[in-house]
Amino acid sequence: MKKFFFYFCLFLFCFIQNSWSDDFIINNIVINKPWIKSIHSGQKVTSGYLEIINNSKSDDVLLSIESNFAKNNQIHSMNIQNDVMKMKHLKSGLLIKVNSKIGLKPGGFHLMFSDINEELKNKKFLYKKLNFKKNGSIEIPFQIKKKYTKDHVNHKH
């Protein structure tokens, strides 16, 4: 009986662990794995990332993002032109075509938060509200992650 109970608890634990999801759904929009880069003391800018899947029957637009921890919350594009990184605020929002997905990730589209007014130390999540043109708004938790690239770690001054 003890053996059965042990395996039952082990199964239940594994099931519960795997059932936790980083997916959030609003109408026909799925948002996967939202996260933001952690910041150092005194830093006033950070960025956020996620994947958006549009399962609706028409295009939609991520119009804006809202959060209390930063005064400025913007959607940005980023690309390299003539070996120079260029970021652009997408004032009209980010188009998500019908039946497609778009990744907001380092080196590409991303969310930019500046004039940060809240200490992020000891926090694991921050809530942000995403506003879509057709599918409405949803407030979701963004996991705070330390993210360092190999290039950054080996950078020498």
Q: Residue ranges of each PLM-predicted region?
A:
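Positively charged n-region of N-terminal signal peptides that target proteins for export
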Residues: 1-4
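Bacterial N-terminal signal peptides
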Residues: 7-15
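Sec/Tat signal peptide C-region and signal peptidase I cleavage site
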Residues: 17-21
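Compact, glycine-rich, soluble single-domain proteins
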Residues: 22-157
